[in-house]
Amino acid sequence: MDKIKRIEEMEKIMDKSADIFSELNAVLDKLYENLPDYRKLDQYYSSQDWFSDAEDSNNNLLPEDLKCGVLSEDGAYNLFGENHELAIRMVEIAAKMLRRE
């Protein structure tokens, strides 16, 4: 590979990486800002309020047009599982970045 092509290739990689890092920083900011709300959801899911709300939903005591996905055990379970897997993935990627792999 000649010098010009190599420099052009490295320039493209640098620009692409800078864009990705910028996008990731913005998403990480949103994730961090959402943590208190996510913790609130996690606490709700294991609270007596959730069980009471789910029972009311099962007994058709809530408005029919009320969005109640949060009362689905599968929905919350899937979200909590995704959170766990995402956290592991972030740690694994961070380790690779720090080791420069």
Show where each model-derived region lies.
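Long, low-complexity or tandemly repetitive, helically biased scaffold regions used
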Residues: 3-101
